[in-house]
Amino acid sequence: MKFRAKITGKGCLELFIHVSGTVARLAKVCVLRVRPDSLCFGPAGSGGLHEARLWCEVRQGAFQQFRMEGVSEDLDEIHLELTAEHLSRAARSAAGASSLKLQLTHKRRPSLTVAVELVSSLGRARSVVHDLPVRVLPRRVWRDCLPPSLRASDASIRLPRWRTLRSIVERMANVGSHVLVEANLSGRMTLSIETEVVSIQSYFKNLGNPPQSAVGVPENRDLESMVQVRVDNRKLLQFLEGQQIHPTTALCNIWDNTLLQLVLVQEDVSLQYFIPAL
């Protein structure tokens, strides 16, 4: 097994710093899935979708160099388990750097070596090297690391402005622990919370629905009908506060009374966060 990658350019370096920071804020331990065309972050363990979980893919276009050899020709992948904060801390040291290199090494034990090339104000180059301990996962547990295979959602809608959404959810989190998220195929979305003493509702309209949201919809379905899911407010707020990328596309997908999925896309990065219904 071999893996080596290099990131250069301010934009790509900042993107990787933000991605690793997002993963660290949402998971203590993660699985790094190295594929021929991408680097994927997933949750450790086999919890399924019974708890909030994050998957993130960084495609090959974000790297100047990307080379890997998997465990075999038929199984051309590598799965590494590591502490997410260790990778985030190493990536943060690349702020203002000229490059960041990732390499699978074996220094007494398997490690993910992160080498950062820095240039001082006097033009002198220096390297900072982080050796992060990893556990190479056996093939028998790979299936637990895959993102879920799901049918088309019952509703898919574009998210409102991030700061507005985060502010609303933060206020609701101070009132109660559960939030009801509703959306339809006509661009409307509602967030609501209700306790014995207070009821709060926030309405959004004209958000827009992605084109694929209409695929497979029965002809007789009322596009104004709302699909809903009640989720843990703290988990939703954790994602809204924790994610650090600047998405060009932000979607909310709902499986009625079953699952909430938030999808963010920025250039060569896609991020999915799943929150199960209560």
UniProtKB/Swiss-Prot annotation:
GO biological process, one term: telomere maintenance
Coiled coil (UniProt feature): none
Family recorded in the similarity comment: Belongs to the HUS1 family.
Subunit structure: Interacts with RAD1 and RAD9B.
Protein name, UniProt field: Checkpoint protein HUS1B
Any Gene Ontology CC annotation: checkpoint clamp complex
Tissue expression notes: Expressed strongly in testis, less in spleen, thymus, prostate, colon and leukocytes.
